[in-house]
């Protein structure tokens, strides 16, 4: 892991799991630039697992992502394997885009939007 994000390991992994789950659900989130860049590699790996589509890949993704509800019928794992992976079936990597924004007014942190392409 390249960036520590000012947190200890457990807190950092919980943050990234939460952000990865939210990105898969909403397909676009606004966060700091460092978090977005760190999140990019994790989400790319999750989408690659989704494209593989076998039981072991599903269990690996379920072990990392939080089991959040996307709507009444689906959760984040179902959305990853059914919707998101199918969309990128012909694409070899590069599933996310990081767009830089202005600094946050309160503390001047560099902000960015990370979204699924």
UniProtKB/Swiss-Prot annotation:
InterPro entries: Ribosomal_bL17, Ribosomal_bL17_CS, Ribosomal_bL17_sf
GO function term, MF aspect, one: structural constituent of ribosome
Residues passing through the membrane, by range: none
A single Gene Ontology CC term: cytosolic large ribosomal subunit
Domain of life: Bacteria
Coiled-coil regions, chain positions: none
Keyword terms: Ribonucleoprotein, Ribosomal protein
Keyword Ribosomal protein: yes
SUPFAM superfamilies: Prokaryotic ribosomal protein L17
GO biological process, one term: translation
Family classification: Belongs to the bacterial ribosomal protein bL17 family.
Summary of subunit composition and partner proteins: Part of the 50S ribosomal subunit. Contacts protein L32.
NCBIfam families (UniProt xref): L17
HAMAP family from the UniProt entry: Ribosomal_bL17
Descriptive protein name: Large ribosomal subunit protein bL17
Taxonomic lineage: Bacteria, Bacillati, Bacillota, Bacilli, Bacillales
């Amino acid at each position: 892991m390249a960036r520590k994000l000012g947190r200890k390991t457990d807190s950092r992994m919980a943050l990234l799991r939460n952000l990865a789950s939210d990105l898969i659900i909403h397909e676009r989130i606004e966060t700091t630039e460092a978090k977005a860049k760190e999140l990019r590699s994790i989400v790319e790996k999750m989408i690659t697992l989704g494209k593989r589509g076998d039981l072991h890949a599903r269990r690996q993704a379920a072990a990392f992502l939080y089991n959040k509800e996307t709507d009444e019928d689906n959760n984040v794992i179902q959305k990853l394997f059914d919707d998101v992976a199918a969309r990128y079936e012909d694409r070899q990597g590069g599933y996310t885009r990081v767009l830089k924004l202005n600094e946050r007014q309160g503390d001047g942190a560099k902000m960015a939007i990370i979204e699924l392409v």
